[in-house]
Amino acid sequence: MEPTASGIFCNRMLSMVNSEDVNAIIQAQRHMLDRFEKTNEMLINFNGLSNVRLQQMNEHFLMHTRTLIEMKKDLDSIFRRIRALKGKVAKQYPEAFSNVSESSNLEDDDDEFDPIPASVATITTTATSEQSTESCDTSPDVISPTISCCSEDPSQEHTDTPTSDSHEQPVLRDEGPDSADI
């Protein structure tokens, strides 16, 4: 039989393709497929670990957020108590409290030069059972920087706390987040 044109064309096309090259290409594709499968498996493991870690961090974040919210509520409560105590002191000793308010306004003008006036730094006050029986106030708006707030009995005061025999009134300032300037 005489070869047909299509048969000749097919034979020449087949003879142009080198079987070694085809086998090398197939081998390279199998190698790449193995690498892609391993990479895919590693990425799946990484995603799983990342999701677990994200859940852990989310729980920690929520816990810390709740802690911050509770701390803010506690601080708001503390500042409310301080304002109530200031109001009580203002009602019990209106003359002294008005003098303190006037002197604090004058001292606010001098704060540029002396951040803590010497008269305020040497005043010592002790907390009484009328003021608080719950806990010590360690907030930044303490009446005086030298106050021993945990001491309810004067005999239990710290000996390193400076005292003064002067009859000056302590400066009461409310620096809480909800306070208005006096």
Curated annotation (Swiss-Prot):
GO BP annotations listed: lysosome localization; vesicle-mediated transport
Pfam (any one): KxDL
Domain of life, per lineage: Eukaryota
Keywords, comma-separated and alphabetical: Lysosome, Membrane
Gene Ontology, cellular component aspect: BORC complex; lysosomal membrane
Record bears the keyword Membrane: yes
Chain spans, region Disordered: 124-182
Compartments where located: Lysosome membrane
UniProt biased composition (Low complexity): 124-135
Chain coiled-coil ranges: none
Residue stretches of biased makeup (Basic and acidic residues): 155-176
The family this protein is said to belong to: Belongs to the KXD1 family.
Assembly and interaction partners: Associates with the BLOC-1 complex.
Function of the molecule: As part of a BORC-like complex may play a role in lysosomes movement and localization at the cell periphery. Associated with the cytosolic face of lysosomes, this complex may couple lysosomes to microtubule plus-end-directed kinesin motor. May also be involved in the biogenesis of lysosome-related organelles such as melanosomes.
Name by which UniProt lists this protein: KxDL motif-containing protein 1
Gene that produces this protein: kxd1
